[in-house]
């Protein structure tokens, strides 16, 4: 087998917008910032929460004259 053909697999820190952070390993080589993690995602927390990305829900409601 050929040597040195695989990317480097290093430890990175993933930080969520809720403030939660954890360490994992990745070939990306830099830290990640994510919007939703298992600590704040409605499926894992059991709380109903509307996740609006870039105002898309508001644009939809405005287009069809729906109340919030």
UniProtKB/Swiss-Prot annotation:
The keyword Ribonucleoprotein applies. Gene3D superfamilies: Ribosomal protein L31. Transmembrane segments: none annotated. Keywords: Metal-binding, Ribonucleoprotein, Ribosomal protein, RNA-binding, rRNA-binding, Zinc. Zn(2+) binds at residues 16, 18, 37, 40. PROSITE patterns: RIBOSOMAL_L31. Binds the 23S rRNA. This is Large ribosomal subunit protein bL31. It comes from Nitrosococcus oceani (strain ATCC 19707 / BCRC 17464 / JCM 30415 / NCIMB 11848 / C-107). The lineage of its organism: Bacteria, Pseudomonadati, Pseudomonadota, Gammaproteobacteria, Chromatiales.
